[in-house]
């Protein structure tokens, strides 16, 4: 009974793509098993102004492009102990006093085509007061044509294409679905690296740190998908007395219908119902 219910929630409602690459930034001083979220690749980042790691076929470089800013890992210990392994730790950019933090992420190895990148922004330090928002941009080549005499000369330069802004950072939120999130989409046309900038907006922020807890490539925007399912992902001990259990979840923004699939394997699901409610009673379950 447990297995069928679990497969429905994890594979259908959460819609985890087998192609998605997911990284959980961990505090470097703890064991990965203690602080890594389910289905995420652990990366413990040591203090410095640059850090490089591999993720599947990708090569990712983190660096702080502003002088005297450093990257380090940090955590909210109580949040980890209560089960939030994704957004209760992460990497933090600490700038000099009065500066706004910036983080540059260079990604090599993305295949040509359309891609997305989700980042979680939940501050693990116990900050109060004004919490700065985040702007996300991509480095993009710009070609300018200039006329010099009878000749036309093309000059290449790099510009920042803004992909998202006014992204709110949460503070010690212990549920990933409720934490600060940025979600961007972009196209890759060749084998050139993709360079993404995260930077704080405004210049008068007493709390001028920037936090990223994890990254997810090429997965649907969580705000538009079902979240917080019951039974929870990987819960193999749900009580399905009499072969029944009521499945519940948080509907995605704007969702009008929900398609329900049940099966014993993620690649062998069968559609059993369509409902307008974010709940469904599964019956005739067996082990």
Spans of features found by a protein language model:
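Bacterial N-terminal signal peptides that target proteins for export
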Residues: 1-7
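Hydrophobic h-region of N-terminal signal peptides that target proteins for export
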Residues: 11-19
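Compositionally biased, intrinsically disordered or flexible polar/acidic segments
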Residues: 20-222
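Surface-exposed loops/turns
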Residues: 111-112, 240-241, 286-287
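Short proline/glycine-enriched turn/loop motifs at strand-loop junctions of beta-rich domains
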Residues: 112, 252-256
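Pro/Thr/Ser/Gly-rich low-complexity, intrinsically disordered linker/stalk tracts
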Residues: 222-253
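Recognizes extended acidic, P/S/T-rich segments that occur
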Residues: 257-287
């Amino acid at each position: 009974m447990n297995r069928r219910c679990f497969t429905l929630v994890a594979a259908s409602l959460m819609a985890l793509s087998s192609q998605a690459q997911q990284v959980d930034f961990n505090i470097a001083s703890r064991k990965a098993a203690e602080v890594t979220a389910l289905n995420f690749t652990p990366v413990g980042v040591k203090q410095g102004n640059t850090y490089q790691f591999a993720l599947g076929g990708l090569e990712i470089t983190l660096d702080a492009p502003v002088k005297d800013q450093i990257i380090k890992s940090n955590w909210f210990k109580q949040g980890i102990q209560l089960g939030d392994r994704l957004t209760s730790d992460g990497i933090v950019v600490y700038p000099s006093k009065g500066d706004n933090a910036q983080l540059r992420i260079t990604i090599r190895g993305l295949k040509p085509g359309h891609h997305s990148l989700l980042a979680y922004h939940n501050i693990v330090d116990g900050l109060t007061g004004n919490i700065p928002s985040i702007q996300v941009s991509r480095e993009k080549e710009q070609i300018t044509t200039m006329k010099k005499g009878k000749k036309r000369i093309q000059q290449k330069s790099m510009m920042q294409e803004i992909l998202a802004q006014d992204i709110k950072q949460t503070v010690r939120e212990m549920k990933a679905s409720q934490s600060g999130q940025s979600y961007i989409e972009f196209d890759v046309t060749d084998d050139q690296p993709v360079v993404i900038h995260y930077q704080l907006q405004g210049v008068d922020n007493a709390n001028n740190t920037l936090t990223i807890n994890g990254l997810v490539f090429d997965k649907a925007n969580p705000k538009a998908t079902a979240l917080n399912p019951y039974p929870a992902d990987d819960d193999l001990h749900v009580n399905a007395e009499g072969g029944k259990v009521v499945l519940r979840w948080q509907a995605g923004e704007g969702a009008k219908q929900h398609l329900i699939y049940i099966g014993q394997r993620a690649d062998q699901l069968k559609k059993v119902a369509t409902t307008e409610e974010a709940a469904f009673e599964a019956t005739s379950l067996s082990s």
